[in-house]
Amino acid sequence: MSFNTFGHMFRVTTFGESHGVAIGCVVDGCPPRIPLEPAEIQVDLDRRRPGQSRFTTQRQEPDQVKILSGVMPDPDTGAQVTTGTPIALLIENTDQRSKDYSEIKDKFRPGHADFTYEAKYGLRDYRGGGRSSARETATRVAAGAIARKILAGVKVRGALVQMGPHKIDRAKWDWDEIARNPFFCPDKDKAAFFEDYLDGIRKSGSSIGAVLEITAEGVPAGLGAPLYGKLDADLAAAMMSINAVKGVEIGAGFAAAELTGEENADEMRSANDGTRFLSNNAGGILGGIATGQPIVVRFAVKPTSSILTPRQTVDRAGHETEILTKGRHDPCVGIRAVPVGEAMMACVLADHLLRHRGQVG
């Protein structure tokens, strides 16, 4: 196995490298007769697309998606719909600058997958990182746009809630604010602070990490599975598969270790439309199965390892040397990871929805 596929019923296989001709994915398991136009996928891709502000990589990629298979005009309406067969999506790479990486061809970047790819395969694609580049995540976003079409009534949203040691004020959370700043930040005041803060990081040639929060509202109670098919286990695996992610928590997460049983357990009351929870420390999942509350997942993204300051390393021959990375890189890769996290949430939920239908109807 080469481990380029995730999902069970809703399966996504991605392909391509950062500096290759193109990247893409094949989505298998999508039900038939779901309306799907390239423009619907493009909306999500444009949110992740690089070069839209000085706070992301200046690599200029239009990320125009092409649907190669799995769709046709509906015989009744004429609208383009899915056929139930594999959907192949292609995104061409148009702004590669492989020469920027020639000086590190034989050197390993500290904190990067260079060393481990070399250890596993005996070589690695130094040109932009190959498959280990965040460029690959554009394909996940494209797949996530299809997954959203399956999730009728479910709203998946994400936000950047921390950059470096600086956290947002949750009392000022405004979902509408996210579209007004380049950080996907729901706190207007903190977004203004991040602008100056990240400018300083960027101008110094360094980078910084971040924490992102992804939520899903409208997920029906009962979605998921116990033990080895847990919804939260699959969500954690999906988020950990994103480049640069080093930690995942659901609901109260690690803070639950500081709570008593009385504080942590989400008490329940009867309501007109079913059961009402008085809190959501569980993050919308108990025993691997959705409670019907909002699902809340947070993940930590490490600082970009390709930075402009000299670092000590070794080369392929094992000789000690110094490395300074050129090229165009995100000073905070967490910014563009918000749409990626949303996509992975959508893909996992779509997969579990189809599995749920297969088991209980």
Swiss-Prot record:
It catalyses: 5-O-(1-carboxyvinyl)-3-phosphoshikimate = chorismate + phosphate. InterPro entries: Chorismate_synth, Chorismate_synth_AroC_sf, Chorismate_synthase_CS. One of its GO terms (molecular function) is chorismate synthase activity. It is an enzyme of class 4 (lyase). Reduced FMN (FMNH(2)). The keyword Flavoprotein applies. Pathway: Metabolic intermediate biosynthesis; chorismate biosynthesis; chorismate from D-erythrose 4-phosphate and phosphoenolpyruvate: step 7/7. The keyword Transmembrane does not apply. It holds the Pfam family Chorismate_synt. GO terms for biological process: amino acid biosynthetic process; aromatic amino acid family biosynthetic process; chorismate biosynthetic process. NADP(+) binds at residues 48, 54. Its EC number is 4.2.3.5. One of its GO terms (cellular component) is cytosol. Its cofactor is FMNH2. FMN binds at residues 131-133, 243-244, 287, 302-306, 328. Keywords: Amino-acid biosynthesis, Aromatic amino acid biosynthesis, FAD, Flavoprotein, FMN, Lyase, NADP. Signal peptide: none annotated. Homotetramer. This reaction introduces a second double bond into the aromatic ring system. Belongs to the chorismate synthase family. PANTHER family: CHORISMATE SYNTHASE (PTHR21085:SF0). This is Chorismate synthase. The gene is aroC.
